[in-house]
């Protein structure tokens, strides 16, 4: 079956499907609508699925690893088109992904799930400010961390970086310690590694 056949069939099966939009999106991605779907590369199969999904008029859009197999340019294009789509027609979009930093600026709420358990759920801004790192001499870092909610400590050659939940404790800090925010990707990794 060819890509344009898929587009035509989707229009028959889904009342809210916009075939014109699908063709515009296919063109934006340089997806050959005359190509057989079985001959498409992994990336272009993903693009074909995204074109179909973004052309549906649905209140909820669920995307599981939507950029799997896409190169960096196509991933950026997808995120741009997803935002344009949302601005034209606001709806709930759920994205399951391991490429957290790529979607960090697109999302309003984040749920971190590990092995079926919800570890954290909050607005993206709340999650961004929920963790931090402290680095310095290992002995100073260990002393700082005593009694705090430590996710993990990376240590190498007498220097350590600790990842913690909460906000820096100014009373514990000294001029030998540095603090920094933890991005969502690092927070996800450290939360899901905890206890391993």
Which residues are covered by each model-predicted region?
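ABC transporter nucleotide-binding domain
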Residues: 78-164
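Conserved catalytic motifs of ABC-family nucleotide-binding domains
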Residues: 57
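C-terminal coupling/interaction segments
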Residues: 152, 156-196
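Catalytic Walker B motif of ABC-type/P-loop ATPase nucleotide-binding domains
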Residues: 61-65, 70
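ABC-family P-loop ATPase nucleotide-binding domains
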Residues: 1-48
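Surface-exposed alpha-helical interface segments used for non-catalytic interactions
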Residues: 4-5, 76, 80
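Helix N-cap at the start of a conserved alpha-helix in ABC-type nucleotide-binding domains
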Residues: 72-74
């Amino acid at each position: 079956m060819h890509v344009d056949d898929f587009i035509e069939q989707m229009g028959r099966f889904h009342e809210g499907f916009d075939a014109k939009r699908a063709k515009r999106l296919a063109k934006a991605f340089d997806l050959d609508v005359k190509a057989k779907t079985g001959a498409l590369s992994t990336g272009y199969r993903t693009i074909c699925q995204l074109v179909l999904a973004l052309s549906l008029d649905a209140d909820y859009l669920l995307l599981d690893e939507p950029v799997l197999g896409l190169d960096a340019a196509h991933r950026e294009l997808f995120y741009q088109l997803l935002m344009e789509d949302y601005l034209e027609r606001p709806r709930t979009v759920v994205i399951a992904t391991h490429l957290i930093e790529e979607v960090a600026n697109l999302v309003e709420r984040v749920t971190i799930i590990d092995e079926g358990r919800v570890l954290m759920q909050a607005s993206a801004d709340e999650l961004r400010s929920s963790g931090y790192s402290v680095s310095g001499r290992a002995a100073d870092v260990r002393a700082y961390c005593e009694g705090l909610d430590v996710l993990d400590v990376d240590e190498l050659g007498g220097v350590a970086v600790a990842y913690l939940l909460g906000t820096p404790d100014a009373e514990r800090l000294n001029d030998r310690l540095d603090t920094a925010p933890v991005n969502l990707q690092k927070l996800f990794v450290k939360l899901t590694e905890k206890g391993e």
